[in-house]
């Protein structure tokens, strides 16, 4: 496969040092692992392509990031309608979702929206979405 033009120097170096690496083979193997996990009841979610802080990035950056996830990860996991936001952030601090970012994420198929932080969890069920705060169980 032709190397993308946007590879940084570290990736180019790694690929040069591993001439046996085959992206298509790696993708096929990853898809098999994902399917085996799904067969056991696992669900997959987006955490964004680039671990983005959705409350701080522009709509355009969110769209570009989401497109990368949809093109590169969805084919491996069979798609998902769940997004778990990075950095304990959320789309809004308002009680109900609205706005361009929500409408965009909804338009590309997301129905379940979760943040991850150390505050008390919550659940919000609306006609157009399910929103849940989730407890961060990472150990620092």
Predicted stretch roles:
Residues 39-44, 127:
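Sequence-level motif detector for i,i+2 pairs with an aromatic at +2
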Residues 56-140:
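C-terminal active-site subregion of NodB/CE4 polysaccharide deacetylases
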Residues 9, 30-36, 45, 64, ...:
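A sequence-composition feature that detects small, non-aromatic residues
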Residues 43-51:
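Histidine-centered catalytic micro-motifs
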Residues 1-40, 75, 79, 91:
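Active-site beta->alpha N-cap acidic-glycine motif
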Residues 22-23, 51-60:
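Second-shell loop/turn segments in exported
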Residues 27-28, 34, 42, 69, ...:
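Generic detector of bulky aromatic hydrophobic side chains
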């Amino acid at each position: 496969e032709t190397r993308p033009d946007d590879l940084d120097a570290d990736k180019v170096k790694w690929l040069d040092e591993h001439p046996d690496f085959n992206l298509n083979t790696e993708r096929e193997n990853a898809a098999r692992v994902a399917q085996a996990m799904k067969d056991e009841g696992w669900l997959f979610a987006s955490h964004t392509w680039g671990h983005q802080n959705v409350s701080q990035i522009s709509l355009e950056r969110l769209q570009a990031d989401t497109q990368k996830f949809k093109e590169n990860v969805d084919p491996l996991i069979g798609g998902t309608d769940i997004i778990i936001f990075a950095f304990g952030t959320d789309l809004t601090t308002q009680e109900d979702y609205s706005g361009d970012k929500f409408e965009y994420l909804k338009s590309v198929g997301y129905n379940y929206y979760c943040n991850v932080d150390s505050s008390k969890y919550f659940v919000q069920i609306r006609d157009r979405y399910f929103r849940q705060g989730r407890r961060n169980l990472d150990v620092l």
